[in-house]
Design a protein with these regions (language model features):
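Single conserved hydrophobic/aromatic residue that forms the stacking wall/gate
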Residues: 166-176
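Middle-to-C-terminal accessory/interaction subdomains
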Residues: 1, 6-168
Length: 176
């Protein structure tokens, strides 16, 4: 995909071996699912891909992080990092899932497996209905807004241009 992977600690040997194993095996059947489940924390990967798509995080290619303990039987896990290009109004109707399937080698391998696709759909639906339910998110945003509102003035004094990005609601409340 033209993206260089940076190793912060350890090496890519185990990761590349996992990709090679999945690429070399027919992973779309039941045995493929057993192989997938033995190598990765499936829920961790689904959460990572789902949030990337849900947030329309256009910088996903160079903002992926994963890790695995160096012990027998450990599985690959994923982290959510750097969503600075996520939840951007200009990308609100953008579908990144096609891009992820096309350019994210591991995801493109996994979607060949029916069990993975079903788990992905079920976990994504659960996130939409629970984790990202509108009232739940509104309550979280409101509670965080109350915590940080006293810092808005200091932030604007230091980074005055960011005030241009504020909503009219914030301006109406005297924050800009």
């Amino acid at each position: 995909s033209g993206v260089d992977l940076l190793v912060v600690e350890g090496d890519l040997i185990d990761y590349n071996a996992m990709i090679n194993i999945m690429s070399a095996n027919y992973i779309s059947d039941t045995n493929g699912w057993i192989l997938i489940d033995s190598l990765i924390n499936v829920n961790s990967f689904i959460d990572h891909v789902f949030l990337t798509g849900y947030a329309a995080n256009t910088s996903w290619e160079h903002n992926r992080e994963w890790w695995k303990e160096k012990s027998a039987g450990s599985k690959w896990q994923w982290l959510i990092v750097d969503l600075d290009r996520g939840f951007n109004y200009s990308n609100i109707f953008r579908n990144l899932f096609d891009n992820l399937i096309e350019d994210y080698e591991l995801f493109s391998l996994l979607v060949e497996n029916q069990v993975f696709k079903q788990k992905f759909a079920q976990r994504s639906a659960a996130h939409l209905n629970n984790t990202f339910a509108p009232m739940r998110i509104q309550n979280i945003v409101d509670s965080l807004s109350n915590v940080i509102s006293s810092e808005i003035t200091n932030h604007i004094e230091r980074w005055s241009e960011s005030c241009l990005l504020y909503t009219s609601d914030a301006a109406d409340e005297g924050h800009c």
